[in-house]
């Protein structure tokens, strides 16, 4: 798949992961994630919660699952299913509590459908996602070394 203005590249300790972001599904979430990427927010952030057969979660600056960027996002629930490779926003009990934390599904997770904001899907590098160390919490966790928007490199 060709890189676009909505291609997010995560350089992880397990290798690169490309995500095609979907502003048609979640314009507010995509815009905010792009802002955070361009600020370097995700650089060095660990995958703090990784459940085998379910998902890998990242985006907490404390590495514990309790932190965020400080800006809550209004839910943008959509009809896109949670399947292998889906990227979706983590949140607390309130639907409008998503912030900077997100997860990548290892497998189908239809029980999350219409309850979490899907904002993209892995387009390449899913084999690297599969290698991320599991745990709750993860011991010596894998991390995002650098997050970048693909076309920013060409500018």
Describe each region flagged by the PLM.
Residues 1-155:
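Cyclophilin-like peptidyl-prolyl cis-trans isomerases
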């Amino acid at each position: 798949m060709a890189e676009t203005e909505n291609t997010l590249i995560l350089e992880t300790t397990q290798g690169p992961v490309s995500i095609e972001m979907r502003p048609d599904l979640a314009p507010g979430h995509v815009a905010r994630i792009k802002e955070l990427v361009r600020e370097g927010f995700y650089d060095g952030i660990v995958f703090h919660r990784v459940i085998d057969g379910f998902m890998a979660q990242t985006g907490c600056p404390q590495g514990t699952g309790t932190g965020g960027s400080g800006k809550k996002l209004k839910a943008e629930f959509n009809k896109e299913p949670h399947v292998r490779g889906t990227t979706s926003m983590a949140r607390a009990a309130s639907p409008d509590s998503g912030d900077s934390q997100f997860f990548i599904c290892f497998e189908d997770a239809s029980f999350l459908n219409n309850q979490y904001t899907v904002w993209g899907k892995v387009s390449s590098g899913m084999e690297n996602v599969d290698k991320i160390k599991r745990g709750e919490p993860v011991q010596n966790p894998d991390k995002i070394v650098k997050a970048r928007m693909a076309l920013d490199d060409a500018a």
